[in-house]
Amino acid sequence: MKTPRPRLAGAMLASAFTFNAFACGFCIEDKIAAVYDHAVAIRAVAQRHQVAFFAVEGNIPPGEGSRRAIEAIAESLVGVDEGSARVSVASASLSVAFDPARVPAEDLEIQLGRKLAGKGLTVGIMRIMDKPSELKVTGKR
């Protein structure tokens, strides 16, 4: 009788590499890039606002409906700039521009988490963009 140990060992090894891939800095950069909108970032910095990038955990149904629903939830929060929410269902990430004088980033994360909990989703801040230097363009055009 065959034992499933070699398959189990292989599955465990594969899952270890998968976990490390999700936790790597490059993957975070990919998630941020998927929801980065330069026009939103420029406008936010000009208004002394910030841009928050969130990882979204949970089962997000694919499609435009999910994207629009999450964007609407994000934009309904106090302090979030209207029209600034960007969602990537494929990369499970979200960005919003917000006024830190009206809502600190940590409170924004809590409020967003509460609103998305009903959909079985949680969020975690990946990065906050708050300095014009982060938008510096280098090289010749």
Name these PLM-found stretches:
Residues R43-I60:
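Short glycine-/aliphatic-rich beta-strand segments at the starts of folded cytosolic domains
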Residues R68-L77, D107-L116:
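Short amphipathic alpha-helices in soluble, non-transmembrane regions
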Residues F22-K31:
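Cleaved targeting-peptide boundary
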Residues M1-M12:
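Bacterial N-terminal signal peptides that target proteins for export
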Residues D99, K131-R141:
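Short, low-order "capping/linker" segments at domain edges
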Residues V89-F98:
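Surface-exposed aromatic
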Residues F98-A105:
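Helix N-cap motif at beta-to-alpha junctions
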Residues T18-N20:
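N-terminal signal peptide c-region/cleavage motif recognized by signal peptidases
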